[in-house]
Amino acid sequence: MASYKVNIPAGPLWSNAEAQQVGPKIAAAHQGNFTGQWTTVVESAMSVVEVELQVENTGIHEFKTDVLAGPLWSNDEAQKLGPQIAASYGAEFTGQWRTIVEGVMSVIQIKYTF
């Protein structure tokens, strides 16, 4: 199965030992595998860990949740942008969405498979 690597924010990491301890947990939260690589991107404030993700997640379990999607102005826009927004979370767009603050923020429903 095809995979790719991304850097995921991990908060400040103070040592390689700490990164090796928390990296696998962060990766698991994103359905991925920690590669062992990490770097500090803002001194004393933010580090990132490298995670390998599968292009398509498989499994028998599903979990649906709402995620922020920025302002969406119509169903047509939501249906067009929803799949890409969901993909950025490693999930699939269910087609459901709603506005939570008029003119400011909408949410889309996504489905994780694992």
Curated annotation (Swiss-Prot):
Binds 2 carbohydrate molecules per monomer. The 2 symmetrically related-binding sites exhibit similar affinities relative to one other. It is found in: Cytoplasm. This is Lectin MVL. Induction: Induced under low nutrient or anoxic conditions. GO terms for cellular component: cytoplasm. The keyword Cytoplasm applies. Keywords: Antiviral protein, Cytoplasm, Glycosidase, Hemagglutinin, Hydrolase, Lectin, Repeat. Its EC number is 3.2.1.-. InterPro entries: MVL (IPR021992), OligoMan_bind_ChitinaseAct_sf (IPR053754). One of its GO terms (biological process) is regulation of defense response to virus. Sequence repeats lie at residues 2-55, 61-114. Pfam families: MVL. The gene is mvl. The lineage of its organism: Bacteria, Bacillati, Cyanobacteriota, Cyanophyceae, Oscillatoriophycideae. Displays hemagglutinating activity from pH 5 to 8, but is inactive beyond these pHs. The keyword Repeat applies.
